[in-house]
């Protein structure tokens, strides 16, 4: 399976947990299987965005901040990640 296809499957599965009211399970799935290599492809950015969104949904502000910070450092214009990072409560 191609890496981008595997990433999309992870995103769909993790997002399904969020849709079922279990965003922390989606975050756990992504953290267990997703990697953040030195050479990034678009699917790595999508994985980080999904992790940040699900962490925020789960009330894990620190986890959301970490995922969105990593993403914004790689690509400040990726979707609305910069805005989402700014809107997260401090601490």
Regions found by a protein language model. Give the residues of each.
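Alpha-helical adaptor scaffolds
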Residues: 1-51, 58-60
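Short coil/turn linkers that connect adjacent helices within long alpha-helical scaffolds
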Residues: 37-41, 72, 76-79
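Register position in tetratricopeptide repeats
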Residues: 19, 57, 87-91
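Short, charge-rich amphipathic alpha-helical segments embedded
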Residues: 1-10, 74-90
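Charge-rich, low-complexity linker and terminal segments
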Residues: 65-66, 83
């Amino acid at each position: 399976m191609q890496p981008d296809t595997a990433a999309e499957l992870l995103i769909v599965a993790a997002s399904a947990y969020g849709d079922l009211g279990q965003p922390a399970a989606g975050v756990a799935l992504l953290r267990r299987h997703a990697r953040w290599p030195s050479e990034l492809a678009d699917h790595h950015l999508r994985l980080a965005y999904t992790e940040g969104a699900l962490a925020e949904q789960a009330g894990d502000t620190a986890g959301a901040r970490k995922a969105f910070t990593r993403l914004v450092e790689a690509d400040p214009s990726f979707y609305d990640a910069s805005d989402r990072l700014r809107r997260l409560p401090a601490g």
